[in-house]
């Protein structure tokens, strides 16, 4: 059997040209990889010339071991060179969890788990219930007031036996009341005017009587002051006496006529007409 070197060339690892020395033992590569902090375990390959299998089986084993070492070294290099990616992944997972905990809606997780709604605390539920009650109370009060008003109206209609008066009826009733008040005021004014007329007529009658008495006194004084020696004055003919009686009769007739006819005119007329008629009667 021929001796087979138990080393990997540098060209097999990364495809570069081999170094001038020609070969590098696999033990050095394994020692460098163990120095790196990695969670993945790997095994050292220490070739032994004693009891080696055939050439084909040895080559297959070497290829498998080389692939494993390459994969582990690549992962370690990525973690060392880009630690930010690892932090980003962790931060993203934390934010996803926080959002899922705070949200009240149902959310689906990446693995397919379904999150239920987070129940609110007792204080928040009580606050919401109080707000709903406050909003519902005024609506219920308005509905109750409307129902009460309708019930009162229906009861009044049943009790009275007729419907309530409309606005037109109210206006007519107000107009009738105003008309009655106006008529009463006019009647009161008429009564006052009649009383005033009666008072004025009484004053006129009193003046008329006073004038007649004064006239009779003046006539008596004139007859006493006349000379008694004159025969014509002493001898009074019987024809002259009726003349005096006629004058008195005329004055009485005029007064009676004034008291009957003109009294009505004065009572019906206004103040100016009353004054004019009184002056005309005085001139008679």
UniProtKB/Swiss-Prot annotation:
The keyword Chaperone does not apply. It comes from the Eukaryota. One of its GO terms (molecular function) is actin filament binding. Residues 184-200 have a biased composition (Acidic residues). Keywords: Actin-binding, Cytoplasm, Cytoskeleton, Phosphoprotein. Residues 225-235 have a biased composition (Low complexity). InterPro entries: Ermin, Moesin_tail_sf. It holds the Pfam family Ermin. It is found in: Cytoplasm, Cytoskeleton. The modification Phosphothreonine is found at residue 237. GO terms for biological process: actin filament organization; morphogenesis of a branching structure; regulation of cell projection organization; regulation of cell shape. Residues 1-61, 108-251 are annotated as: Disordered. Residues 126-140, 171-183, 201-220 have a biased composition (Basic and acidic residues). One of its GO terms (cellular component) is extracellular exosome. The modification Phosphoserine is found at residues 73, 214, 226, 230, 233. Residues 265-284 are annotated as: Binds actin. Binds actin. Plays a role in cytoskeletal rearrangements during the late wrapping and/or compaction phases of myelinogenesis as well as in maintenance and stability of myelin sheath in the adult. May play an important role in late-stage oligodendroglia maturation, myelin/Ranvier node formation during CNS development, and in the maintenance and plasticity of related structures in the mature CNS. PANTHER family: ERMIN. This is Ermin. It comes from Pongo abelii (Sumatran orangutan).
